[in-house]
Regions:
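Contiguous beta-strand/loop segments that form the cofactor/metal-binding neighborhood of enzyme cores
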Residues: 2-86, 90-92, 106, 136-145
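Short amphipathic alpha-helical segments
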Residues: 33, 119-121, 147
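C-terminal helix-rich "cap/oligomerization" subdomain common to oxidoreductases
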Residues: 40, 88, 92-94, 124-128, ...
Length: 179
């Protein structure tokens, strides 16, 4: 999941990493984690995985959350093992309700009311046609000098360094400066 987010953020540096890591069922397995990544381009990415996050909603998948990235112009998210997701953008920066208030089930609010019609636009994620086998076929060809590696050594090192920062944050409970 972390490598997917980094791949989608070419050129962006991670400024900080925060992680909450739990062992709910098995002490030897991190079966719950929530990771927050802040980038130098003002994007925040959240990755959450939990083997014990249960739902009884029929429309939800057993493993619902995959990842979500948000900035000041929109959000992209992917859910499920057979990932489905969308990009939701704003046509202009959202603002408070001004002098008015919106009534919600929790009471009145000036900030969390529904946006006016036409402000949010939704689009499909770009279609990607690949399979896991492609990676292994590339590895063999690249190892034999027939083509370049799809995953560069520098990309692998960056993900491993990020995983180390995630572990350190999970251990200390503190945000870790990165890159």
């Amino acid at each position: 999941l972390l490598d997917q987010i980094l791949w989608m953020m070419p050129g962006a540096k991670i400024t900080s990493v925060y992680a909450d890591i739990r062992n709910v069922i098995n002490e030897e397995v991190d079966d719950y984690f929530k990771i927050l990544l802040r980038f130098d381009n003002n994007v925040t990415a959240e990755v959450e995985l939990g083997t014990y996050v249960l739902t009884d909603k029929e429309q939800d998948k057993w493993f619902e959350r995959h990842w979500i990235m948000s900035g000041n112009k929109g959000t992209a998210y992917v859910d499920g093992f057979d990932p489905e997701g969308k990009i939701v953008r704003t046509t202009r920066l959202l603002s408070n309700a001004g002098n008015g208030r919106t009534m919600t089930a929790a009471g009145p609010t000036r900030s969390f009311g529904p946006p006016a019609p036409g402000i949010l636009t939704t689009e499909a994620l770009p279609e990607v046609n690949t399979c896991h086998r492609d990676y292994f076929e590339n590895y063999i060809k690249a190892y034999n000098g027939e083509e370049e590696f799809l995953v560069k050594i520098s990309e692998t090192r960056r993900v491993l360094a990020l995983m180390d920062a995630v572990r350190e944050s999970g251990r200390t409970g503190k945000s870790i400066a990165f890159e």
